[in-house]
């Protein structure tokens, strides 16, 4: 299969092309039904003559080309309708009836605040052009009305509030929010790309529109990605402030699978300047070795790394409710545990050559001994709660 992507250097085009090439090159094996031979990338700097060749060869066309921020409103129609007409005429000249996808906009509904949108009018004209083309040629036509998009590689200070907020937060620039309660419907770029790959496999999600809302059914005139997120500007800004604070607090906010927070965090990180990609951790060091907190979570405890010098014993304490995993990743050590009030000692000899996780049981005093005379013992530790100096739940007692 040969695929033509117009607007290939834009935000959506770049993400789509890289994912198409990952499938083509066997790097993405989640789409075994897709056999991609070539990806034709067409953009403003592509010689126009190449469009003729691409249209002759293409087995599927993603038309992502368009104008978002013209110098004058007349350019909306030229960029969003004019090129679409050229593209379809070129396909016609080669009698190529391959499926064609159009990236339109929710503004094409011309409803509410979009009623007088020149951008929306140009997008609607492009839609009707595609639908007419489909009727005339019997080529499959897939028209997507995108809501607000966000994700990596989106240009800030252009046409995405999320991109601007992420960029400014990451680079310590101010953010202007006129109304924190303003709600946006947002589509994450990876969810959109997955939908476009579904479309390529002949499985688009079809719909019609009830106002601005897609109503999904198999015979719908339009297509839409099924997963979007409705979120307020205030919620976005609050999340970004928590992401920004993570290197200093070590606290990773809740980012459940599929959540907006998870997708926004990934987007935010893509805007970090080089100096923020790396950050220092506080190493608590003494004659015995060191202890460094790595990461804290809001509901799943915290991670730390402990280094014990040769011959050193650490620990010698127990907890009521706190419990831990100890995982030796380098060196040779002995972990001992004894239930408080009992004389029986549980012993586990561990080595970094064979990583094993050892429970530090509640109500058991425990220690960890470096058995080596020459090498440090390095242990990754997880505790089921963040350390609270006011309630440490830690009591000294030798094993």
Task: Outline where the language-model segments fall.
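NAD(P)H-binding glycine-rich loop region in Rossmannoid oxidoreductase-like domains
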Residues: 44-86, 90-94, 107-114
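Mid/C-terminal beta-alpha module of Rossmann-like enzyme folds, strongest
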Residues: 198, 202-283
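Short acidic-glycine-tyrosine-enriched beta hairpin
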Residues: 339-363
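NAD(P)-dependent short-chain dehydrogenase/reductase
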Residues: 131-143, 147-184, 189-202
């Amino acid at each position: 299969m040969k695929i033509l992507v117009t607007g290939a250097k834009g935000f959506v085009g770049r993400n789509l092309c890289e994912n198409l090439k990952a499938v083509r090159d066997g790097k993405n094996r989640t789409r075994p039904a897709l056999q991609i031979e070539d990806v034709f990338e067409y953009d403003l700097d592509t010689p126009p003559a190449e469009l003729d060749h691409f249209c002759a060869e293409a087995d599927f066309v993603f038309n992502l080309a368009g104008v978002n921020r013209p110098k004058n409103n007349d350019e909306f129609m030229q960029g969003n309708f004019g090129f679409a007409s050229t593209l379809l005429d070129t396909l016609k000249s080669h009698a190529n009836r391959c499926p064609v996808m159009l990236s339109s906009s929710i503004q094409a509904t011309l409803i509410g605040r979009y009623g007088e949108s020149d951008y929306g009018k140009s997008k609607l004209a492009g839609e009707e052009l595609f639908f007419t083309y489909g009727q005339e040629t019997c080529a499959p036509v897939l028209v997507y009305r995108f809501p607000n998009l966000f994700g990596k590689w989106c240009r800030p200070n252009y046409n995405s509030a999320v991109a601007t907020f992420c960029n400014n937060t990451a680079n310590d620039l101010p953010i202007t929010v006129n109304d924190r309660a303003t709600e946006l419907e947002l589509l994450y770029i990876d969810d959109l790309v997955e939908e476009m790959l579904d479309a390529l496999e002949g499985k688009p999600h079809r719909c019609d529109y009830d106002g601005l809302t897609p109503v999904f059914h198999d015979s719908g005139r339009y297509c839409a990605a099924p997963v979007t997120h409705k979120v307020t500007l205030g919620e976005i800004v609050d999340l970004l402030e928590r992401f920004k604070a993570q290197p200093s607090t070590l606290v990773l906010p809740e980012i459940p699978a599929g959540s907006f927070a998870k997708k926004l965090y990934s987007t935010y990180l893509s805007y970090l300047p080089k100096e923020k990609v790396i950050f220092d951790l506080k190493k608590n060091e003494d004659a015995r070795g060191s202890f460094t907190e790595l990461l804290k979570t809001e509901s799943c405890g915290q991670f730390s790394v402990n280094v014990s010098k040769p011959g050193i014993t650490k620990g010698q304490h127990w907890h009521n409710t706190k419990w831990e995993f100890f995982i030796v990743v380098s060196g040779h050590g002995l972990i001992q545990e004894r239930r408080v009030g009992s004389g029986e000692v549980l012993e586990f000899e561990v080595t970094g050559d064979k990583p094993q996780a050892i429970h530090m049981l509640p109500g058991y005093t425990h220690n960890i001994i470096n058995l080596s005379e020459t090498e440090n013992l390095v242990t990754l530790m997880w505790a089921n709660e963040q350390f609270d100096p006011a309630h440490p739940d830690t009591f000294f007692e030798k094993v």
